[in-house]
C-alpha cells in the first residue's frame, strides 16, 4: 500500500535528550510537549488552524493523562482537534506516525499533529484495588522500573530483548561492536560544525522551563548524559 501522507520539510522537531533524573525530570511530559509544540509551531509560522486531527503517544502516564491528546492540543493552542492517545511500549512512536498517516490517507483529516512524549524519571507508583484480596488489600506497581524489568508476555526484562534477537539471528559480538562504532561515528558527525545537523530539527541552545512553565530553570547546549 502506498501512502499519500507527507511530513512537510522542516515541520518536525525534538527536544534534546536528557539523562535519567536529569534536566527534564521535574517536568510533566504532556505539559512540556505542549509547551515545546506551541513554540516550535510559532517559530515555523505554522498556522494552527490548519490542523484537524491529532495523535498522541506516551508509555508512562502522568497526572491528567486520562484526557490525552485533546488536553495537550488545547495547551498547545490547537483546541479544535481531537484524536487518540496511543501506548504500545517501544513501538509507540511508530504507531503514532502510522495512525496519523492512515487518517490523512483515508481522507478523514487533511493535516494531523503527530506528537509523542514521555518522562521515565520519577515514574508513578500505582495501586490496584482488589476487594477479594487478603483484608481487601490490592496489588501495586512501580510503572517504569517494574515494566522495564519484566515483559509479561515474554517473561523477561526489556534489556534481554536485544540479546534474544542477536541469538536468534546469529549476530555476534564483533558485528554488534561494528554497529556501536558506526552509531558513534554518526553521532559525532551530528555534533560537527556546532551541532549543525541537530539544529535542523532541534532548537539549541534549549531553554528548560521550571515546573510551572514561567521561568527558565536551565539551558542545554545539546543532549545531556551521552558519552562520546
Where on the chain are the PLM-derived regions?
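Short acidic, glycine/serine/threonine-rich loops at helix termini
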Residues: 21-22, 66-67, 122-128
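Active-site-proximal alpha-helical scaffold in enzymes
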Residues: 84-118, 166-196
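Conserved catalytic cysteine-centered active-site region
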Residues: 58-111, 141, 152-157, 226-228
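Short, well-ordered amphipathic alpha-helical segments that serve as non-catalytic structural scaffolds
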Residues: 29-45, 68-72, 96-99, 158-165, ...
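N-terminal extracellular/periplasmic Venus flytrap/periplasmic-binding protein-like
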Residues: 14-15, 26, 30, 34, ...
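Flexible glycine-/small-residue-enriched beta->alpha junction loops
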Residues: 111-164
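Condensing-enzyme catalytic core mediating Claisen C-C bond formation in acyl metabolism
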Residues: 1-27, 141, 167, 226-228
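Active-site pocket-shaping loop/turn-to-helix segments
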Residues: 14-38, 61, 84-98, 110, ...
Amino acid at each position: 500500500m502506498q501512502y499519500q501522507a507527507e511530513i512537510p520539510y522542516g515541520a518536525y522537531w525534538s527536544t534534546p535528550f536528557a539523562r535519567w533524573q536529569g534536566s527534564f525530570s521535574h517536568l510533566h511530559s504532556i505539559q512540556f510537549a505542549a509547551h515545546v509544540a506551541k513554540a516550535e509551531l510559532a517559530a515555523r509560522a505554522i498556522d494552527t488552524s490548519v490542523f484537524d486531527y491529532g495523535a498522541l503517544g506516551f508509555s508512562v502516564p502522568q497526572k491528567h493523562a486520562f484526557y490525552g491528546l485533546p488536553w495537550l492540543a488545547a495547551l498547545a493552542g490547537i483546541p479544535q482537534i481531537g484524536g487518540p492517545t496511543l501506548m504500545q511500549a517501544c513501538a509507540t512512536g511508530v504507531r503514532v506516525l502510522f495512525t496519523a498517516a492512515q487518517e490523512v490517507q483515508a481522507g478523514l483529516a487533511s493535516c494531523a499533529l503527530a506528537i509523542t512524549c514521555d518522562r521515565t524519571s520519577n515514574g508513578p507508583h500505582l495501586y490496584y484495588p482488589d476487594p477479594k484480596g487478603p483484608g481487601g488489600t490490592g496489588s501495586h506497581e512501580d510503572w517504569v522500573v517494574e515494566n522495564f524489568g519484566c515483559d509479561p508476555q515474554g517473561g523477561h526484562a526489556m534489556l534481554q530483548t536485544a540479546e534474544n534477537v542477536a541469538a536468534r539471528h546469529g549476530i555476534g559480538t564483533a558485528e554488534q561492536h561494528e554497529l556501536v562504532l558506526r552509531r558513534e561515528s554518526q553521532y559525532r558527525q551530528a555534533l560537527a560544525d556546532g551541532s549543525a545537523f541537530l539544529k535542523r530539527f532541534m532548537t539549541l541552545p534549549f531553554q528548560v522551563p521550571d515546573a510551572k512553565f514561567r521561568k527558565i530553570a536551565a539551558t542545554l547546549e545539546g543532549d545531556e548524559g551521552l558519552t562520546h
